[in-house]
Swiss-Prot record:
Record text on subunit structure and interactions: Homohexamer. Forms an RuvA(8)-RuvB(12)-Holliday junction (HJ) complex. HJ DNA is sandwiched between 2 RuvA tetramers; dsDNA enters through RuvA and exits via RuvB. An RuvB hexamer assembles on each DNA strand where it exits the tetramer. Each RuvB hexamer is contacted by two RuvA subunits (via domain III) on 2 adjacent RuvB subunits; this complex drives branch migration. In the full resolvosome a probable DNA-RuvA(4)-RuvB(12)-RuvC(2) complex forms which resolves the HJ.
Gene3D superfamilies: 1.10.8.60, P-loop containing nucleotide triphosphate hydrolases (3.40.50.300), Winged helix-like DNA-binding domain superfamily/Winged helix DNA-binding domain (1.10.10.10)
Residues binding DNA: 296, 315, 320
Role noted for this protein: The RuvA-RuvB-RuvC complex processes Holliday junction (HJ) DNA during genetic recombination and DNA repair, while the RuvA-RuvB complex plays an important role in the rescue of blocked DNA replication forks via replication fork reversal (RFR). RuvA specifically binds to HJ cruciform DNA, conferring on it an open structure. The RuvB hexamer acts as an ATP-dependent pump, pulling dsDNA into and through the RuvAB complex. RuvB forms 2 homohexamers on either side of HJ DNA bound by 1 or 2 RuvA tetramers; 4 subunits per hexamer contact DNA at a time.
A biological process term (GO) from this entry: DNA repair
Annotated EC: 3.6.4.-
Segments for region (Large ATPase domain (RuvB-L)): 1-186
Binding site for ATP: 25-26, 67, 70-72, 133-135, 176, 186, 223
SMART domains per UniProt: AAA
Entry similarity comment: Belongs to the RuvB family.
Feature: compositional bias, Basic and acidic residues: 1-25
Entry protein name: Holliday junction branch migration complex subunit RuvB
Binding-site residues for Mg(2+), renumbered to this chain: 71
Length: 344
């Protein structure tokens, strides 16, 4: 049911890393999927409604931080609907012809998944509008005075878009998705279930305290939990007795630079920079990006969401500031702020 045509995905995307290992760990149905209770409950209703009506399901937009299951949910949707699944990404669709080639090859009610949909070429996006609303494709053939428009009828299909940057989607595109769904960070209990399931599928005997230790440090993200689990298993096999215990998990993750809260070296450099160089802020994001030699997008999409969710930093109109919890995590005392009497 899943089309893995390499022409659709010539470049490896972030979720393709460790794809072979992840495929076995990915749930195959909504019942197997852990977490995102509200999103799953709603999707179950929409899927069942589409099946009973015998129609293509309305278009879906998944948005939220990376690694929370957007691709997995799209694949599950296709399986639950009993239809074909095609996958591509925004940057790959450089020309209108690229999109036309995919859309014209879709069967009735198929699911087309476009990752990083906020990075669609504006020209391609314009072509997508009538396809989403009327299942029609308007293509311009030829150039200059000889140019003419050809309308192509499409089979009804379901577009599933995924983005980590909802604000970068144009309003016309965003409004054409009938089912916008936000995915949130997972709880430690949910991640514990995911880690335990992963260990079981890997054939590793896991102590409940061991899986809980990994879940606690997984930053609320299943993809990170899976990556940490694989590394802890490596340590358990080589330096332990093959069992995943709390001791081996703590030792392995500490050696990998992942602390008790799940922060890694990049996170701690971010916090330390604001604390030591800018006295806790506020400091502009461009300044932080330049000082860390990291792209602004990487900070806003990868590092900051979890720090904000944990209350370690704050975004203000004047820039980023270290919150009290951030100072505490670094083991530092926040600088004393001058009171009004001292200012006068």
């Amino acid at each position: 049911m899943t089309d893995s045509d390499p022409t659709l995905r010539p470049d490896r995307l972030p979720e393709d890393v460790q794809a072979t290992d992840d495929r076995a760990l990915r749930p195959q149905s909504l019942d197997d999927f852990t977490g995102q209770e509200e999103a799953r409950a709603n999707l179950r209703v929409f899927i069942e409604s589409a099946r009973r009506r015998g129609e293509a399901m309305d278009h879906v937009l998944f948005h939220g931080p990376p690694g929370l299951g957007k691709t997995t949910l799209a694949q599950i949707m296709a399986k639950e609907l009993g239809v074909g699944f095609r996958m591509t990404s925004g940057p790959v669709l450089a020309k209108a012809g690229d999109l036309a080639a995919i859309l014209t090859n879709l069967e009735a009610k198929d699911v087309l998944f476009i990752d990083e949909i906020h990075r669609l070429n504006p020209v391609v996006e314009e072509i997508l509008y009538p396809a989403l609303e009327d299942f029609e494709l308007d293509l311009v053939i030829g150039e200059g005075p000889a140019a003419r428009t050809v309308r192509i009828e499409l089979q009804p299909f379901t577009l599933v878009g995924a983005t980590t940057r909802l604000g970068l989607l144009t309003t016309p595109l965003r409004d054409r998705f009938g089912i916008p769904t936000r995915l949130n960070f997972y709880t430690i209990a949910e991640l514990d279930q995911i880690v335990a399931r992963g260990a079981r599928l890997a054939g590793i005997e896991a102590d409940p305290k061991g899986t809980a230790e990994i879940a606690k440090r997984a930053r609320g993200t299943p993809r990170i939990a899976g990556r940490l689990l694989r590394r802890v298993i490596d340590f358990a096999v080589v330096e332990g007795d093959g069992r995943l215990t709390q001791g081996i998990a703590d030792s392995a993750l500490t050696r990998l630079g992942v602390d008790d809260l799940g922060l890694d070296g990049a996170d701690r450099r971010y916090l330390s920079l604001i604390a030591e160089n800018y006295h806790g802020g506020p400091v502009g994001i461009e300044t932080v990006a330049a000082a860390l030699a990291e792209p602004r997008d990487a900070l806003e999409e990868v590092i900051e969401p979890f720090l904000l969710q944990q209350g370690l930093i704050a975004r203000t109109p004047r820039g980023r500031m270290l919150a009290h919890k951030g100072w505490t995590h670094l083991g530092m005392a926040p600088p004393k702020r001058p009171d009004q009497g001292e200012l006068i």
